[in-house]
């Protein structure tokens, strides 16, 4: 992975990408820098949006300023150093301090790649701005998404769009498909991205509630005679379970699309298939864990441990050269 940008930026990338770094480092060289840079750019905006040291309006202004800077609408870099001191993750603080250096890397790519990076980043930031307006500027202490369409829109903006970008980079630099198959791959790529965001949402309900954010739509809760406030009470899990299972089922459908996405990638693209397999397998195992646990219990955080992740990496490396082994591992 070394040598993508420079030692400092590569270190920041590894420090901020956590488990996603496992996929980034397996990507083919032809698209690894573009995807890695988009990740760093999106991680910067996410860090701004989630900074605990700023008032909501300050964060919104900083996010909009960052958006203008990355899109080339402004030549003035946003002043983010004041937010860097509040980051518990040292690498995220360094990311904010190095915003000019990171953004300048966009111009190192072809015009079409620059356009793709900026387009996807703009969509992601639009989702983060919506999030800030919806939650941080809300009058109530616990604000909620209202309906399923809003949840789907959010999942597309912050994650489905990344699947779209990933697909565009792959089709531009790695392999070609006919127009019908290309359209299908884009659709499945969007669902792939949404699946990973839905897992985050369904796993992190207690921590989001603690921040005054409820991503489970209010109307869906009301249909089950529940409110966002009810989700603060872990004893409400059995009442919440039927609705929660509906969202897990939706996530599983998205993961099935992700598997189909991988199966559409040419077999010879070992690195690309392997980098896609990792989050899908980990995602499927996370969904299985979520089905049997009380997700409303803040003390019972559901997480795949590092030893199991390392084992998954080994399994993928062993399986990816073989069609049968890859299929069994994905569909096990």
Model-predicted regions and their roles:
Residues 200-201:
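Short, contiguous alpha-helical
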Residues 1-195, 206-332:
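Catalytic cores of Mg2+-dependent Asp-rich isoprenoid enzymes
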